Amino acid sequence: VRGGWVESGPLDDESRIDRAAAGRVVLRLGRMLRPQRRAILRAVFLLIFQTAALLASPLVVRYAVDAGLVGKSGRAINIAAVVYLILAVTSALLGRSVIWAVSRIGEDFLRSLRARVFRHLINLDLGFFEREKTGRLVARMTSDIDALQELVSQGLVMFVQNALIFVGTLVVMSLLSWQLTLCTIIVVPPVIFASLWFRKRSNTAYLEVRDRVGTNLSTLQEGLEGVRVVQAFGREGGFIERFEETNEAQYDANIATVNIATRYFPFVEFIGVVGLAVVVGAGSYFVDRNILEVGTVLAFVLYLNNLFEPIQQLSQLYNTVQSAAAALNKLFGLLDTPNSVPEKPGAIDLPLAGAMMVSGVAFAYGGGPPDTDGVSHPLGPIVLNDVSITVAAGERVALVGPTGAGKSTLAKLMARFYDPIEGDVSFGGVSLRDATRRSLRERIAVVPQEGFLFAGTVRDNIRVGSPEASDADVDAAVDALGLREHFESFPEGLDTEVRERGSRLSAGEKQLVSLARAALADPTVLVLDEATSNLDPGTELEVERALEALTQGRTVIVVAHRLSTAQRCDRVAVVADGQILEIGTHDDLVSRGDAYAALFAAWTRTE
């Protein structure tokens, strides 16, 4: 902590993977691209023809010089000019075709990958999302995909084309003159060594820039989001000082990359000039002795650029390939993450009605598969231990107890957000482990503590409970809960836009939408996870009335924060230290004078 501010640490270096991992990524990528192999082959053939056109151009110049200028033939010069123009046009057209073909292949792959990752993510168990940070998952779909985007849109073409140009140039130069080729190769090793140095230094420097940019943006975002607190406590000066420090660090990191670039590129240009001087000097020697013609020497001069530039391009491309390989490795790791609550092969539908039975259940958080960074999470302390309870069809049972007792965990097990490590949870005699996911979600609905709304209208958010429902069905669900008048008071009624996360509505209004959503789903079992604990005074009464209407005729499990809710239930189960201490009606438990009576007395004093 410096100056009252918590300093952000550097970002993890996630842009490098070892060769073995890179090899596995390439093999898996090849398998994923197999359906597009014909398109890839077409793109490769186009690229080969384009490279051939580029490599043929210096040979045309050689012909123009030897046959036209030296041979004093205007016809030869005209032929060379026409052929050179044809090659230039052909190369441009082929280049456009190559870029289009490769871009289509890449974009099709990325579209498929994004969809595949999202489908996998949206179906993973709740425990996965409690282990993983949302920001890290978003990064998988944004920055990691962006790293791949750069590779498929530019990198692949550059890599293949530069490799072809380098090899093709060496072959053509060797065929033209092995003597000048040997003279040229002398200056190649310094360029290669310089490029290897640049690759290593620039990768480290660019990672540092990325870290500093992230820290600077984090500082900026934190300051803007907390500007009220900053101004309220007069901390503008301290925050400005902190931002200036992170901004200066970003500046230093950028200057370091500039320093590396200014040492590498001028050196390579200098070596290119040395190579040119060597070729011209040796060429004039061979021309004087009639070993070579002037056109051949000039062609060599033109080929020199084709020899050095690919080395530079491939060196700069290394970081792009490395980042893309690391991004693919992380995305593949995400795709390989198993679901801890999978649907069994041969799963069966839950019955339409029946009792909810929890039998000898034990549960602890953690112990799932490694996260997307390969970090394992050992099994945590036991949260529930040997818990058994039966909720009859149509019965309303409240789960009460102190914070951290295991109430919400028990409710989540009843909805099969998790599977117990011991014991079983069943509905109508069918284990939830054996049930199809579709029937599980149709029979059991959960209303959480905070109603989450998606961008769209109120009607759209209610329809999440049953996407196929008509407007009339939505209206009927709203009317069944007595919420018509409240929703009609909105500017556009049920068609009012709620914006992202329902920012236009209060907490209570969001919960009303959640209740209407549950009513539209029409479940047999309703799990209310402290659904009345985070309400504003203006909607509290309406939420309670809507809840009363929603729970009629349904099996209800309520995680009760307010004991007034427990009073309205058929039975109350007191949960403490991961066990059910007592269970019975409200009146019976109060008369016993044990745990529930103490909770109720304490709650009564605070109300």
Stretches found by the model and what they are:
Residues 350-607:
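ABC-type nucleotide-binding domain
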Residues 40-94, 101, 174-179, 290-294:
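Transmembrane helix-loop-helix hairpins at lipid-water interfaces of multipass membrane proteins
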Residues 31, 35-38, 126-127, 143-152, ...:
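An intracellular "coupling" helix at the cytosolic face of ABC transporter transmembrane type-1 domains
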Residues 235, 259, 276, 306-336:
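Cytosolic ends of transmembrane helices, especially the final helix of ABC transmembrane type-1 domains
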Residues 39-49, 84, 154-208, 279-292, ...:
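Transmembrane helices of ABC transporter permease
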Residues 16, 24-27, 33-36, 98, ...:
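Juxtamembrane loop-to-helix connectors within ABC transporter transmembrane domains
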Residues 27-30, 38-59, 63, 80, ...:
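Alpha-helical segments in transporter systems
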